[in-house]
């Protein structure tokens, strides 16, 4: 298994990365990037800790010990083992503050692995090349070398006023095909952690009007000639004492420019078919979304814990009004946990033999978090009061004259004054810093914004009058409604529906998605 040292050494490979106004010479050592690089290194090193060996690693069929990120769950019990793996990683690294560690990034490839053949059969313009084998080969490479392959799917936010605008946009597109590969030119507008990846996973999110040359699913090394990664300004803080979370690094969102970049056919998974891409805005990220829900449950748990700590330290925890408000936070956490458990218990087996959690339940669980994150943030900040804002600096606290006043200002019925400052600093990092503000924005748009979560999830079951909900209501009303005509969901390609409910496609299910 890869070590953190090996990972850090691999980053000094000539990749072209900007962070704000600075061009980064070495991602592993530059002050704007080194802290998060250390967090990814920590991810790898956790797998070598003897006390975590049984939780984070397994021995595969060939007798090789590997990270559990590569273990495929075969039943609900196996899925719970994977959940424990992800939870442990998240708890150990900045309390679940980073949504794009390697185990999350690499999860997208599970969707390919569940049914790789259709990515080749649905391609247009690949001239019979064995793209299915490309998928198998790249999955093997990821697993054998423990690589980190961030997602680079989001296209520029340019003219959204008409479908025709897609063709005029600077979206990444194929500009030439050769016997050896494709040449692409253009932009991917938002990717998280791209600067820290070994490879980047290129894909697209379908929009009406997208031309076939913009439909590209592939993987390339981050240091590929012609690739430049432009990261936003870093929000990392330099003082671990003052900023216990924000000092641990910024995973950095970025825009990637591809200037006539060559991609060998061996690294291409699918090209050319908007109708195929139309089926995957959510499905390609299914396992990532499950990981998101695990992290959101952990974040909800942290919010409850911080509320309990600060109200006990202040001395307000026994007040009925305060207790009732903390109870709301507990209810939020338990509701999130219920979505997670229910998705696991109502899962199904995919064509590839994996036991997959129920997408409708975990996606609506993600929506529940987004609907409530503003209100739970407000509750925590209000319960904390000035304790999350009026925090003495280390210099003020240690000063021989002023320090005594800050001890008195932070004294309470439980704990010591210094502990209240520590609690306040964590709350401040989460919600009252630019680092925390970026976290909030990431949650809003990570795995699609709220309206898109609802819209996309509603296309993954028959929500028409002929569907389960409609049939029951029709029965109660004593009517027959909507049963004759085929529904939109029924017309969806079987191979896509198999990712929603575990349907077993017939041999002909890999026919064109347009037929």
Curated annotation (Swiss-Prot):
The keyword Oxidoreductase applies. FAD binds at residues 151-153, 157-160, 192, 457-460. Pathway: Xenobiotic degradation. Pfam families: HpaB (PF03241), HpaB_N (PF11794). It comes from the Bacteria. The keyword Cell wall biogenesis/degradation does not apply. Substrate binds at residues 100-104, 203-204. It is an enzyme of class 1 (oxidoreductase). PANTHER family: 4-HYDROXYPHENYLACETATE 3-MONOOXYGENASE-RELATED (PTHR36117:SF3). Oxygenase component of a two-component system that degrades 2,4,5-trichlorophenol. Uses FADH(2) supplied by TftC to oxidize 2,4,5-trichlorophenol (2,4,5-TCP) to 2,5-dichloro-p-benzoquinone, which is chemically reduced to 2,5-dichloro-p-hydroquinone (2,5-DiCHQ). Then, TftD oxidizes the latter to 5-chloro-2-hydroxy-p-benzoquinone. This is FADH(2)-dependent monooxygenase TftD. The gene is tftD.
